[in-house]
Amino acid sequence: MQGQNQQQAYDRGITIFSPDGRLYQVEYAREAVKRGTASIGVRTSDGVVLAVDKRIRSPLMERSSVEKIHKADDHIGIASAGHVADARQLIDFARRQAQVNQLRYGEPVGVETLTKEITDYIQQYTQVGGARPFGVALIIGGIVNGEPRLFETDPSGTPYEWKALAVGADRGDIRDYLEEHYDEGMDLDEGVDLALAALASVNDDELSPEGIGVATVDVETETFGQLTDEEKEAHLAEADLLDTGEDADDEAEDEDATEE
């Protein structure tokens, strides 16, 4: 009983390490990230790709209200997995820091600089009583001096740089797929195809344009932009990943035949 009470104390105390060096609330925040739908980042030779799963809980929900890819600055995009409200707070913080850098130094903020400012902010919430960690992971991609950069933040406030990564649900399976198929020499279009194929690999190899979000930051223009449904559909159709709804139609026909 005493040991159980001690563990509960470490559970509730965000600023207290357990005897084996763990911060339980940070670990629980990481579990919250795993419950979110997947987000993917891919660094290519001429840009960065961000792709997210935008599955909704009800057909009555407007898909446009599900935002998982955000513009932090003209040359930086951010994808999230985990608690949407926590992500929104960090996105707002990132945008403010980008504006401050522009006003203070007269130049756009660097991707690595912005990532470190975000992770410093996140890390503060692992040391202060009366608060909790952010239950969200971010993928931050952008261009600096013609070079694509791709970073991850986690609830502990630790930054990592990647060539390709996934966060959220099925991250292990998606990362295995990326490791097997990633090529550093691929271009931006090939990076989009890889990200979509990785998402499809954990979704029965089928995706709909409305159920995903895709954004790119191009080295040539150094500009963030999101793909339209038509552009996403073209990529999915070319890769034979487009969900045509035939399975649902077949199931409906089977049900009708049974009722008859």
UniProtKB/Swiss-Prot annotation:
Regulation: The formation of the proteasomal ATPase PAN-20S proteasome complex, via the docking of the C-termini of PAN into the intersubunit pockets in the alpha-rings, triggers opening of the gate for substrate entry. Interconversion between the open-gate and close-gate conformations leads to a dynamic regulation of the 20S proteasome proteolysis activity.
PROSITE patterns per the UniProt record, alphabetical: PROTEASOME_ALPHA_1, PROTEASOME_ALPHA_2
Keywords: Cytoplasm, Proteasome
Source organism superkingdom: Archaea
Biased composition (Acidic residues): 240-260
Cellular localization per UniProt: Cytoplasm
Region Disordered, residue ranges: 237-260
Disulfide bond residue pairs: none
GO biological process, alphabetically ordered: proteasomal protein catabolic process; ubiquitin-dependent protein catabolic process
One Gene Ontology term, aspect cellular component: cytoplasm
Listed SMART domains: Proteasome_A_N (SM00948)
Pfam families per the UniProt record, alphabetical: Proteasome, Proteasome_A_N
GO MF, one example: threonine-type endopeptidase activity
Family the UniProt entry places it in: Belongs to the peptidase T1A family.
Subunit (UniProt): The 20S proteasome core is composed of 14 alpha and 14 beta subunits that assemble into four stacked heptameric rings, resulting in a barrel-shaped structure. The two inner rings, each composed of seven catalytic beta subunits, are sandwiched by two outer rings, each composed of seven alpha subunits. The catalytic chamber with the active sites is on the inside of the barrel. Has a gated structure, the ends of the cylinder being occluded by the N-termini of the alpha-subunits. Is capped at one or both ends by the proteasome regulatory ATPase, PAN.
HAMAP family, sorted: Proteasome_A_A (MF_00289_A)
Primary role: Component of the proteasome core, a large protease complex with broad specificity involved in protein degradation.
Cross-referenced PANTHER family: PROTEASOME SUBUNIT ALPHA/BETA (PTHR11599)
Protein name: Proteasome subunit alpha 1
UniProt organism field: Haloarcula marismortui (strain ATCC 43049 / DSM 3752 / JCM 8966 / VKM B-1809) (Halobacterium marismortui)
